[in-house]
Amino acid sequence: DILAAFRVTPQPGVPPEEAGAAVAAESSTGTWTTVWTDGLTNLDRYKGRCYRXXRVIGEKDQFIAYVAYPLDLFEEGSVTNMFTSIVGNVFGFKALRXLRLEDLRIPPAYVKTFQGPPHGIQVERDKLNKYGRPLLGCTIKPKLGLSAKNYGRAVYECLRGGLDFTKDDENVNSQPFMRWRDRFLFCAEAIYKAQAETGEIKGHYLNATAGTCEDMNKRAVFARELGVPIVMHDYLTGGFTANTSLAHYCRDNGLLLHIHRAMHAVIDRQKSHGMHFRVLAKALRMSGGDHIHAGTVVGKLEGEREITLGFVDLLRDDLVEQDRSRGIYFTQDWVSLPGVLPVASGGIHVWHMPALTEIFGDDSVLQFGGGTLGHPWGNAPGAVANRVALEACVQARNEGRDLAREGNEIIREACKWSPELAAACEVWKEIRFEFKPVDTLDPDEKK
């Protein structure tokens, strides 16, 4: 069975057992009345069952309802069908004030019907010939308004300065100021020139997201013809059907696939209603993507540390044990489905490098947009500053130093032999994003 954990807030007077049963029925075989065609099938075989309800400590009107869905309810290899069944209609149920899908347990038999990421972590490292450290990226800013040639120039400066990747922002598609084909051509030129100068393999996340699947595929085909290593997709606004199709194309044609989660906070940010990002992360691993944005913990975007580390493990690891202290409701066995690199991006700069290296580890992508392009000396020095800071943190960690305790000291030491890093540290020494997260663990989940 597929197991689901729902946070249920029923209307006053609706008992938890009745609300849980209603969720199970509405998201499987049930309707609002008895129908004569019920007698034409075996409902016991197909109906969802609420097998447990547990109150949320500290919330008098909330409880967690655990629901089991028989596998025969779902089309093989279709995230679209899975979500249409489990969350498609029940969230508008009048008997509930709020409903949130906290987690899913996907059984191995169903996982095996998905291709998953086009390539996975190890294949990506082998393609790029880069090991033993996080990968470095940068989102080109301003995200909108640049001409294709100026955009390509910014890409080149960042890549030659030491970054592994640059990136289209999520809303860069094919606008009047920069059509997609022109952008692809100038970015490919920048990649090849930077590779020739540095001797390293470089990439730019060319956003293939489009208004139709046909246009999306056309852009991916052109990227392959240019010989670039990676394309990008906005998987929530683009949709799971389009994403899975693109992932299959990328595997067949040797392209890596970067995934942006634009629109996720509309779905996952409120604690009492919607869907937790760990569910969206699991769905992406099944649908297919080699990278996905996962918050930063320390930057400008929402993300509590333990919760973030929980879904980062769900993206990368083969087996993740149940751990309520990190918000993981079920043990998840991925049965060797390739892993996804989490991407830390959003309001981060060189002073965050020790914390990011310690939190996310080697199998991650650290992306500094403003933290590269905002360098007072230009894009290439900004890239140099980030690369020096990363190499210093990785070396210090490998020497046994504590990045959490000695991080600032490690960065200051590196500043002595890198004027680019010293300038970056001076610019961003006062920047903080100290706001309490909205989505936090429940009291009974914390150790």
UniProtKB/Swiss-Prot annotation:
Cofactor binding: number and manner: Binds 1 Mg(2+) ion per subunit.
Protein location: Plastid, Chloroplast
Site residues (Transition state stabilizer), renumbered to this chain: K300
Binding site for Mg(2+): K167, D169, E170
SUPFAM superfamilies noted in UniProt: RuBisCo, C-terminal domain, RuBisCO, large subunit, small (N-terminal) domain
Reaction it catalyzes: 2 (2R)-3-phosphoglycerate + 2 H(+) = D-ribulose 1,5-bisphosphate + CO2 + H2O; D-ribulose 1,5-bisphosphate + O2 = 2-phosphoglycolate + (2R)-3-phosphoglycerate + 2 H(+)
Note: The basic functional RuBisCO is composed of a large chain homodimer in a 'head-to-tail' conformation. In form I RuBisCO this homodimer is arranged in a barrel-like tetramer with the small subunits forming a tetrameric 'cap' on each end of the 'barrel'.
Protein name from the UniProt record: Ribulose bisphosphate carboxylase large chain
Organism name: Convolvulus tricolor (Dwarf morning glory)
Taxonomic lineage from the root: Eukaryota, Viridiplantae, Streptophyta, Embryophyta, Tracheophyta
Gene from which this protein is expressed: rbcL
